[in-house]
């Protein structure tokens, strides 16, 4: 921990890029150091979906509020974001929200059903549906996110990660209408209406840029883009329908703030993600991180990549696997320990605590 002046080194390696806002001397900047590949102590640890249903404190709130009510209430956004910080002392907070707030702002109707997941009430079925989607000229409908970030600022002693969904993943929900097993509808658009599909992706990307810039202005310290369904794409499809729009978003951010790109399929697409020069690439659990370092050199950080199912294992096995990954990445100044995807809802808090404590017990 140290006095941190919110100094963010450019993703193009321009070390004099400075963002203001002085943070107190108790601020834990370990994640930000790792995102600059300058961390000389133990790796930072945070976990995707760390503020979720596996926490008893979260489930208690869900008994009082719907998921969307919690996403729309700035005080609840702040409260839920802080739950894993208080429970586990992880090295970063990730904003409590959902990747479907942009489709909600686009008025396609979003609801969440228990044991089903997100449902799009008015899915995209034709070109006219795409043409009707508004451009991001007014972000008033997302003001609750900005206010949630502002509620968090005085209460955090770790970096806050803002996020959005990648255009391809968000479009998948908007076209399929819900989580899909085969993605036939979106593949139909790719092959039969590619230009219309590109129009949709561009609109989502423009909304994503405006939304992420709003989060930057509100005070987040880093960003992550989730491309959860990229693993359904062929290599050429990934280049055309995902990577191009991630690059477009990266260029549209108004400040040199660290950006983590995570996609399912990063064991294949990782070098391509690195080619557009984010601060970090998030890896799924199907690759060996050390080998990815051979093809993704400094100054790009690597984040990941424990199997999420590890958290169902006996506690000694969790410690063993965490220590094996820490040993493998020993001395890597740009390594961030995380899962290869989000925490499952029925995982025990004891398992998560064991993972985090194993990292925190490392020297430094």
From Swiss-Prot:
Protein name: Uroporphyrinogen decarboxylase
Any one GO cellular component localisation term in the record: cytosol
Entry-linked CDD domains: URO-D
Pathway(s) where this gene product acts: Porphyrin-containing compound metabolism; protoporphyrin-IX biosynthesis; coproporphyrinogen-III from 5-aminolevulinate: step 4/4
Keyword Lyase: yes
Location of the protein in the cell: Cytoplasm
Function: Catalyzes the decarboxylation of four acetate groups of uroporphyrinogen-III to yield coproporphyrinogen-III.
GO biological process, one term: protoporphyrinogen IX biosynthetic process
Pfam family, one: URO-D
Site (Transition state stabilizer): 98
Catalysed transformations (reactions): uroporphyrinogen III + 4 H(+) = coproporphyrinogen III + 4 CO2
Keywords annotated in UniProt: Cytoplasm, Decarboxylase, Lyase, Porphyrin biosynthesis
EC class: lyase
Binding site for substrate: 49-53, 98, 173, 228, 341
Family indicated by similarity: Belongs to the uroporphyrinogen decarboxylase family.
Entry annotated with the keyword Ribonucleoprotein: no
Enzyme Commission code(s) on record: 4.1.1.37
Subunit (UniProt): Homodimer.
GO molecular function: uroporphyrinogen decarboxylase activity
């Amino acid at each position: 921990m140290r006095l941190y002046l919110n100094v963010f080194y450019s993703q193009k390696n321009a070390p004099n890029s400075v963002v203001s806002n002085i943070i107190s001397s108790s601020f834990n900047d370990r994640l930000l150091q790792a995102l600059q590949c300058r961390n000389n102590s133990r790796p930072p640890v945070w976990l995707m979906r760390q503020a979720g249903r596996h926490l008893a404190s979260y489930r208690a709130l869900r008994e009082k509020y719907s998921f969307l009510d919690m996403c729309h209430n700035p005080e609840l956004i702040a409260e839920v974001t802080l739950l894993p910080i208080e429970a586990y002392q992880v090295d970063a907070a990730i904003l409590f929200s959902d990747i479907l707030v942009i489709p909600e702002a686009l008025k396609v109707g979003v609801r969440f059903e228990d044991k089903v997941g997100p449902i799009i009430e008015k899915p995209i079925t034709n070109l006219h549906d795409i043409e009707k989607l508004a451009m991001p000229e007014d972000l008033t409908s997302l003001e609750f996110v900005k206010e949630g970030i502002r509620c968090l600022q005085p209460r955090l002693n770790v970096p806050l990660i803002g996020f959005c969904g990648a255009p391809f993943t968000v479009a998948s929900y908007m076209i399929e209408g819900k989580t899909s097993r085969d993605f036939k509808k979106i593949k139909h658009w790719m092959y039969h209406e590619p230009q219309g599909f590109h129009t949709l992706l561009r609109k989502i990307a423009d909304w994503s840029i405006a939304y992420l810039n709003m989060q930057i202005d509100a005070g987040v310290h880093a960003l992550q883009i989730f491309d959860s369904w990229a693993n359904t794409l062929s290599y050429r499809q990934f280049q055309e329908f995902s990577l191009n729009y991630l690059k477009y978003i990266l260029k549209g951010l108004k400040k040199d703030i660290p950006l983590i790109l995570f996609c399912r399929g990063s064991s294949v697409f990782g070098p391509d993600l690195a080619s557009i020069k984010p601060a970090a690439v998030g890896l799924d659990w199907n690759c060996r991180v050390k080998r990815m370092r051979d093809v993704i050199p400094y100054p790009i950080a690597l984040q990941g990549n424990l199997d999420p199912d590890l958290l169902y294992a006996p506690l000694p096995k969790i410690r063993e696997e965490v220590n094996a990954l820490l040993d493998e990445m020993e001395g890597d100044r740009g390594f961030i320990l995380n899962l290869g995807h989000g925490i499952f809802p029925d995982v025990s808090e004891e398992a998560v605590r064991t993972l985090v404590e194993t990292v925190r017990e490392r020297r430094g």
